[in-house]
Amino acid sequence: METWTFASASIIVKVLISILVIFSVIILITRISGLRTFAKMSSFDFASTIAIGSILASVVLNTNQSLLKGSIALGGIVLFQTFFSYVTRKSKRLDSLFTNSPVMLMYEGKILYENLDKTNVGEDDLIAKLRESNALKFSEVRAVILESTGDMSVLHSSETTELDAKVLQGVKGIPDYVNL
């Protein structure tokens, strides 16, 4: 009998077998499709990873769920993700439609408050990211970029090294006074 805190031995065995099978399927799919399957390169990749996790949890925890159906669903999501990534790579128009552009949040030690507002990022979050990246002074920060994945990249140096224009390619919200 299954209760809130206990489950029968047969249920536990089914869950353990489900874990073994579905994780084997995940490993096989990842080996076939490549590591990009779980890379957070775009918001679509992030959504795909969440969907994969949701399917995985459903199959493992719901003992009435078919392992074959779960495996097909996982394969389908990865296949669609691969197709979607290929199509957006080939078409700049589709890429710009479905992918967020990175946004400059800080440049040469100055916080770009207008861009913080546009991206709904708080100054405290920005400062926390600076600490996390071991930036010691605002003057050492060359740029902070909110990437299309939602991650923040902090480019800092104690030298007066100029940023290569290629590093800032595709970044929105670069101040007008910056000559790249």
Segments the model singles out, each with a brief description of its role:
Residues 169-180:
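Structural signature of multi-pass, alpha-helical inner-membrane proteins
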